[in-house]
Amino acid sequence: MAKSLLFGEQARRSMEAGVDKLADTVRVTLGPKGRNVVLDKKFGSPLITNDGVTIAREIELEDPYENMGAQLVKEVATKTNDVAGDGTTTATLLAQAIIREGLKNVTAGANPIQIRTGIRKAVEKAVEEIKVISKPVNGKEDIARVAAISAASEEVGKLIADAMERVGNDGVITVEESKSMGTDLEVVEGMQFDRGYVSAYMVTDTEKMEAVLDDVYILITDKKISNIQEILPILEQIVQQGKKLLIISEDIEGEALSTLVLNKLRGTFTCVGVKAPGFGDRRKEMLQDIAILTGGEVISEELGRDLKDVTIDMLGTADSVKVTKENTTIVNGKGDKVAIKERVSQIRVQIEDTTSEFDKEKLQERLAKLAGGVAVIRVGAATETELKEEKLRIEDALAATKAAVEEGIVPGGGTAYIDIIPKIADLTSDIIDVKLGIDIIRKALEEPVRQIANNAGAEGSVIIEKVKATEAGVGYDALNDKYVDMLKTGIVDPTKVTRSALQNAASIASTFLTTEAAVADIPEKENTPPMAPGMGMDGMY
């Protein structure tokens, strides 16, 4: 395919136009008085959102050079979302500001490589200073504040704080759509996995269609059980003790299933069978997790164990097990606490070592089931459009809260960026172009406050000067149009979000400035086939 080429200033300006189109679309959403953007969808109703990365992902421009610029800034938003889960609008805004100021200097004859050196130097210093002013998150109140600022809702803030308090730092919190109008929180205590009973005849409560087993033995195996003779010895031992049994296996079928159901219906013996969770190697690991949690052993051919040789001490135990059509929950497994801690540490190491986001997510779920718990925030709304918008806001707030717990919080509303400007201004260099790069970051750090003020109908430049004149930590409360101590008022941003937004914006923008040529495909023209003879309108009456 043939290519079109642009060089120097023309290439940079064409790409900058794309950067501006994307960033100008996203920037209107920043701050407590930011607006929403409507995204057209091929199927279903349009999506209304103020989530920067969601908006950025939808933007594809017709001009190939403009599109290149837009895609580069889209990467800033995506990377920030991957690392911190929030701050994508701020990152986009910073990238635009660095590119705009940088191109002015490059056009005036400055060396882009030296400018990039200055930008990197300034960002390193900025990140250092952000960490210095960072404060750790203390308790439920701080968590609620972070979530409330991100979601622009105090109710959501309280909900997320409740969820984090109940499942702990190792817990997993998921956001799902609710069938009702309200938004509520459901916390699953104990270990839950998505497998239900193999036969409805095994239920103990026919009204709720669930089986609840108290003080229960748990047989864990990766084998398929079809012959009752295989498990008869262990069944006889359990019957003698008058206990109940949960069997977790690859499957229960044939004679084994019918015998267990028959004994349950006769009232001789209560046993519930469920299929093992997961697939392949992940299944083996999950069965081992259950075994450690309950103090049992996995009966597996790989380990040279046979079902006929199972004894009572190989079984797991738990205070209670609840089995529904779709889920099994094990509460208060009687496993050895030291063994559980060792398993948790092992999973943490695997989380740090893995590069796959999917694997990391699955490992985090396993960790939560062993060490914390699982909370589900069910989001409800009157219409599907409102539901999607609400869900995106809660997901952002949840990510921001987790980031805050990890690295702490700084004054919000762009105040942290303003507070570190004097430290950036102190940086010097003998090379003029490096000094220009430092100045570019110094100016760019004003941009978030300017945009928050503009979106609130105030004059950005005036607000910036007033914030600079106040003591550190005091910023502009755009919602109430006044200057307040941001930390005391609860207007805070996660340190991780503030830091990664600047780092990612500077990384892409400084590389953008070094562009000297751009190459794009020339779209091929579609050759319309000639009209066949007689297909015209001539001769018709």
UniProtKB/Swiss-Prot annotation:
Matches recorded under PANTHER family: 60 KDA HEAT SHOCK PROTEIN, MITOCHONDRIAL
Enzymatic class: isomerase
Superkingdom of this protein's organism: Bacteria
Catalytic activity annotation: ATP + H2O + a folded polypeptide = ADP + phosphate + an unfolded polypeptide
GO cellular component: GroEL-GroES complex
Subunit structure of this chain's protein: Forms a cylinder of 14 subunits composed of two heptameric rings stacked back-to-back. Interacts with the co-chaperonin GroES.
Gene3D superfamilies hit by this protein: GroEL, GroEL-like equatorial domain, TCP-1-like chaperonin intermediate domain
Protein name per UniProt: Chaperonin GroEL
Family note: Belongs to the chaperonin (HSP60) family.
Entry keyword set: ATP-binding, Chaperone, Cytoplasm, Isomerase, Nucleotide-binding
Alphabetized HAMAP family for the sequence: CH60 (MF_00600)
Principal subcellular localization: cytoplasm
Biological process per Gene Ontology, one example term: protein refolding
Cellular location(s): Cytoplasm
GO molecular function: ATP binding; ATP-dependent protein folding chaperone; isomerase activity; unfolded protein binding
InterPro entries reported for this sequence: Chaperonin_Cpn60_CS (IPR018370), Cpn60/GroEL (IPR001844), Cpn60/GroEL/TCP-1 (IPR002423), GroEL-like_apical_dom_sf (IPR027409), GROEL-like_equatorial_sf (IPR027413), TCP-1-like_intermed_sf (IPR027410)
Chain's role: Together with its co-chaperonin GroES, plays an essential role in assisting protein folding. The GroEL-GroES system forms a nano-cage that allows encapsulation of the non-native substrate proteins and provides a physical environment optimized to promote and accelerate protein folding.
EC numbers for this chain: 5.6.1.7
Species assigned in the record: Clostridium botulinum (strain Hall / ATCC 3502 / NCTC 13319 / Type A)
Record: residues binding ATP: 29-32, 86-90, 413, 477-479, 493
